[in-house]
Amino acid sequence: MQIIDALNSSRDETVALFGLDDADLARTYGPGKWSVRYVLHHIADAETVLFERIRRVISEGRRVIWAFDQDAWARGLDYSTRPMGLSRDLYLASRAGIIHYAARHYDHSGHLEWVHSETGVRTLRDEFDKVVRHNEDHVKQIRMALDRHTASQT
């Protein structure tokens, strides 16, 4: 199943990044952008939010589900001091649940609709796909941050 392969692949690539040293975690992919540390914490928190949405759609049907303010979470949950191991564990637990439900519901129930408070009507399949896309987009940002440092060293 293609979605399962994509979820596993993006998980494996992301988990390795939680082990970066403090110097690499402090790097950014551009001026004024989040550090790698913040991006990884955000990936973990977003994964928990996406997992909740998936479970709500499967269990409660069509309803409005509210967006979350990523900057408020970064401040309120103090990404600057949060342990990387905590975020890694949150990420892995949420991803395991998402993979489980994707295997059971992506094809069978992917048509189920819900309403995102900012973007409107979406489907369960859309949300599973977003998990992969969101993760991959942020891993690209992390790679850019690490590559910027490597390029500046040469």
Q: Where in the sequence are the language-model features?
A:
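Short, contiguous alpha-helical
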Residues: 24-70, 99, 112-154
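Terminal targeting/low-complexity segments that flank the catalytic cores of oxidoreductases
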Residues: 1-5
